Amino acid sequence: MAKTLTIRYTSDTHGYLYPTNYADMQDRPMGLMKLASEYPHDGNTLIIDGGDTIQGSPLTNLYQRLSPEEKAACLSEDTYGTHPIAAMMNLAGYQFVTLGNHDFNYGVDALMDYLTNLDALCL
């Protein structure tokens, strides 16, 4: 009996959650929220990210500049302490990630904040 395996792969999302280009505020076919809404969770699909994930958008740049107190004020109780990109990737069902060079831009502490909140296995 033949089975089908589908691989969904992202790379270089650079912290974009929303399908919006902030320069002109137009919807685009981009962003983790747009992509994740299309992922099947059927047991036959692997969802993988190739890195350069946590740096580059206005959201991730702001997140890295917030103090722990400011993060607590912005996040609800059920998401407090969860890196926003990790939270979205967890909801999307990512199973595996690798790291890209830009994932190191904010330093080791920021990278570990992301990885420790991520359900996916970092290869």
Predicted regions and their residues:
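Acidic, metal/ion-coordinating pockets
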Residues: 1-123
